[in-house]
Structure formats: structure tokens, C-alpha cells
């Protein structure tokens, strides 16, 4: 059992984390073994290092920490056993994908992913799947570069064609004058 002082430290720590995090995802973890949760944590650690954590915290402590971090509308997420995923560094969408796919692979009820906050905006359990299907930031950057690059490549091709035609015309004029 935690002492009051330990609980206050947890609330203070979680409040500071929630103030700077880009993602908070609440999940029901019942039915998973310790080995399962260790596997999930190692997948997150592999991708994010210390930038993401999946942590089991008492609802009363989460409630106080979220209140201190000035979040609103989180009460519905704090029913039943709750684990919290938070991301402080890296792409938050990728973390949602990791957890979503983990629950899917373990054949867990996906509605147990309760919802949370992405970049400060609240999302529900129904929206977790949509977020998991979004492209990552890296994929979005690649798509953007491809879209920007395509017209430039086309322009270069057109301009080189015009220059090539100009060279052909000049060669034809030169040959005609030399006759």
C-alpha cells in the first residue's frame, strides 16, 4: 500500500507529464498477463525509448493528476481498471498503432481502449481505430515531399523538352544555311 507521501509524488509526477505529453490513451488492462504487458512495454520502449510509457495508476491518482494538468472531460475514462499510455517524445499516432495492434493480436476487445487526448484534443474509444489507421508523421512527410516534387519534376521535364526542341531548330537552321 502506498503512503500518502508516495501518492502525492505520483500525482505531481503524472501532472507534469500530462502537461507536456502529446498523447494520453486510457485502456482497460484486465485479462492481460504480466508477460503480455511486459511485451507491450518493450515494443513501446523499442520504438520510443523513454519517450512513451504504458503505466498502471490508480484512478483516484489519475483523476488528481489530470485535474492538476487542467484536462477536462476525462472522467468517463477512469472507470474500472485503467492503464495509461503517454507519449512525451516522438509520433503519438505510432504509439496508438502499437497499442491498438497489440490488443488486436491478443484478440482483446478493442472497446477496452477507452479513448484519451491527442495533442490536447479528446478522442473516444470509437475513434481509437481511426487514429491507429492514420499515417505516421514520417509517412505524411514522405507523401508531402512526393506531392511537392512531382510538379517540379514535370516542370523540369517540360523545360528540358523545350530546350531540346530549340537545339533541334537551331541545328536545322545551321544545316539549311550551310547548304
Curated annotation (Swiss-Prot):
Coiled coil: none
Database matches in SUPFAM superfamilies: Ribosomal protein L10-like
Pfam families: Ribosomal_L10
Domain of life: Bacteria
Keywords carried by this UniProt record: Ribonucleoprotein, Ribosomal protein, RNA-binding, rRNA-binding
Any one GO CC term of the record: large ribosomal subunit
GO biological process, one term: translation
Family annotation (InterPro entries): Ribosomal_uL10, Ribosomal_uL10-like_sf, Ribosomal_uL10_bac, Ribosomal_uL10_bac_type, Ribosomal_uL10_CS_bac
Keyword Ribonucleoprotein annotated: yes
Molecular functions per Gene Ontology: large ribosomal subunit rRNA binding; structural constituent of ribosome
Subunit structure and binding partners: Part of the ribosomal stalk of the 50S ribosomal subunit. The N-terminus interacts with L11 and the large rRNA to form the base of the stalk. The C-terminus forms an elongated spine to which L12 dimers bind in a sequential fashion forming a multimeric L10(L12)X complex.
Chain's role: Forms part of the ribosomal stalk, playing a central role in the interaction of the ribosome with GTP-bound translation factors.
Protein family (similarity comment): Belongs to the universal ribosomal protein uL10 family.
PANTHER family in UniProt: 39S RIBOSOMAL PROTEIN L10, MITOCHONDRIAL
Official protein name in the record: Large ribosomal subunit protein uL10
Organism: Thermotoga petrophila (strain ATCC BAA-488 / DSM 13995 / JCM 10881 / RKU-1)
